[in-house]
């Protein structure tokens, strides 16, 4: 990447936000559902996951029309997970990034449905990438479903909930982080490799790199 990170983020984060809004605005859905979805999209955040998709492509000197759609797909999954994590049955948080959480504004039921809608929209986005080959679309859908499902983010959240009542060892903590946070971060980098149509060897190298990025993300 020839640009500094700060410049790259300033150039691309607004484009990500614009694409996210467009994807939701064009939906023919109940107004309160749309408001709930937009509310969480507007809640802030660094857009780390979609930026990783774009940064991987930038580092490989690849430009694709559908890159922002793929980048937004992973951000939709991330945002849906935050809505559900904040619910009373999970982490029971009233605030996120200084704003009332979705369920405190729209109620538990609509918050759940807004999260569900975002999850579905993420996969819908991956089917609308006209510049990609069907094999690329299928691989992206497979990887995102794995990263966000029982083997990834959802499974990590279950492990996290199970570990709340006891002390965890290093291996258990790593298992949680690899799934709950690392899986989507890894997908973001692997998605860039798929979009760039890298060979299996290069994809493997980026996958190993992505794994370490996911772990490093937990260091404070």
Where are these regions (language model features)?
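Mg2+-dependent prenyl diphosphate-binding active-site environment of isoprenoid biosynthetic enzymes
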Residues: 12-14, 24-220
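N-terminal amphipathic/basic leader segments beginning at the initiator methionine
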Residues: 1-24
């Amino acid at each position: 990447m020839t640009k500094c990170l700060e410049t790259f983020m300033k150039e691309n984060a607004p484009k990500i936000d614009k694409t996210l809004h467009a994807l939701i605005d064009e939906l023919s859905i109940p107004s309160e559902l749309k408001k709930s979805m937009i509310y969480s999209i507007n809640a802030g955040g660094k857009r780390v996951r979609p930026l990783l998709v774009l940064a991987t492509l930038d580092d490989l000197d690849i430009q694709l029309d559908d890159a922002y759609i793929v980048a937004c797909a992973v951000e939709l999954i991330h945002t849906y997970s935050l809505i559900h994590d904040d619910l009373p049955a999970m982490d029971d948080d009233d605030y996120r990034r200084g704003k009332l959480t979705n369920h405190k504004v729209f109620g538990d039921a609509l918050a759940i449905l807004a999260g569900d809608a975002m999850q579905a929209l993420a996969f819908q986005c991956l089917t609308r990438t006209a510049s990609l080959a069907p094999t690329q679309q299928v691989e992206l859908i497979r990887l995102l479903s794995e990263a966000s499902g029982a083997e990834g983010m959802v499974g990590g959240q279950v492990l996290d909930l199970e570990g709340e009542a006891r002390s965890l060892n290093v291996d258990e903590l790593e298992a949680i982080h690899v799934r709950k946070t690392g899986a989507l971060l890894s997908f973001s980098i692997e998605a860039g490799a798929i979009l760039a149509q890298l060979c299996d060897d290069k994809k493997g190298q980026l996958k190993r790199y992505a794994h370490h990025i996911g772990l490093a993300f937990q260091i404070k």
